[in-house]
């Protein structure tokens, strides 16, 4: 079944909104909250940091939301090409190549060229994206059956839940959710090469990579609804919102016995993240692609996020390599005394945006 292959503007804007907080938005809120006149921002500033271990804040959503959006694009990219006659084998090789590139970029991001490979951390944000996308995209490419895709999603949910809840770890038993006794730590120590960032486990490790593919597939099903369903745009947004609310409810109900922990990528964390991601996607899709709300100022805001969203991996790597804040300080350092450190961060965001705009 074919459908529209046009790229949804809301996807790029939502991805840009997501990346904005990583490249400086979160730090800007935190710095502004330190000003006496803006102290009311302190509760929001807390949301701009990760929880220490168990629980959930807004900033914990950034990574899984990106994964979810990557899944949403599959019907618009891979399936669109398959419909045009591109061989599945060629598409599969493209997915594998992309995964390898992301893994390599992740290793470079971790400082392979700077520090060498001795005591190097191989697990990375980009590596997890690459592996999880490889799993999700391969499932979609190797079968046209939606039923098969659903079964694979269910299998991943059951596999990770079973591992984390019921598989005993030698010396400790089953059902531990901590950095030492859990199945994540055990498998990372046995299978993951290099340094583990937390000593006994890595929050981007073996179990996490497989678990995160659930978000890719969840996004894929949302993408199928958006691209292929004959429902009206409003109905699509409503269905996504309802599904999102249901996933959030499931996560909260299960959380007393299956904790919401980002560092372990527990399935309750995935349910909660996917649920919020669905609601955000529904909101952005409804406002931008269905209602097409315009206005000069609003259009500029959308364009601001769209530029970031179209260059997400580029800006992620660039912020690691280019000292944007030091460049900003060169131009705005004289304003720190009268205004505060926030002006440096704001200047860095502006420089980053124009860097992407002129690429």
Regions found by a protein language model. Name each.
Residues 1-359:
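Alpha-helical transmembrane segments and their immediate juxtamembrane cytosolic regions
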